[in-house]
A protein has these predicted regions:
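Hydrophobic beta-strand residues in large extracellular and virion-surface proteins
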Residues: 39-41, 72-75, 101
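Acidic-basic catalytic patches of nuclease active cores, encompassing PD-(D/E)XK
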Residues: 1-45
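Intrinsically disordered, low-complexity regions
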Residues: 14, 49-51, 60-63, 96, ...
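Non-catalytic C-terminal interaction segments of nucleic acid-processing enzymes
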Residues: 66-71, 86-129
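Short, flexible beta-strand-to-coil junctions
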Residues: 44, 55, 77-81, 94, ...
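Structural motif
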Residues: 28-34, 49-56, 75-80
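Active-site-adjacent loop/helix micro-motif of nuclease/hydrolase catalytic cores
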Residues: 47-68, 81-87
Length: 129
């Protein structure tokens, strides 16, 4: 089941980033598996690495792969367990300036996804939120 979820989210992510790029046309290359990441996208102005984790089991191993030298996205299913895993490690995630987390609701009739940038969210919001 995990492999099907991973394959689904990988395909969803490729479609999502291609659709976002329809107007700007900045994508130069999309590659699977570069440097141990699920997806790599070379834009004209940056590189972005994607980690696809349908169910976040070990968030610390994900955090160890991230740095401030490139753009990173964590793509996961929108579930209470995944949300709680992110909250548990929030204090670590806010230190990565170019990290975003995409929570995907593939079968929702309305909101298909929501995205949070921990670094930015921490800078502009109240600690209690």
């Amino acid at each position: 089941m995990e492999n099907k979820s991973h394959a689904f989210l990988l395909e969803w992510t490729v479609n999502f980033i291609k659709n976002k790029d329809i107007i700007s046309r900045k994508i130069e290359k999309i590659k699977n598996g570069k440097d141990g990441f699920d997806l790599y996208v070379k834009y004209k102005d940056r590189e972005q690495y994607f980690i696809i984790a349908p169910n976040i089991i070990d968030i610390d191993s994900i955090i160890k792969r991230i740095n401030n030298n490139a753009y990173f996205s964590l793509v996961t299913l929108n579930s209470k367990e995944n949300f709680d895993a992110v909250l548990k490690s929030w204090s670590k995630m806010i230190s990565f300036k170019f990290l975003n987390i995409i929570f995907v609701n593939p079968f929702s009739g309305l909101d298909k996804k929501w995205i949070v940038f921990p670094y930015t969210h921490h800078k502009i919001s109240d600690e209690s939120s």
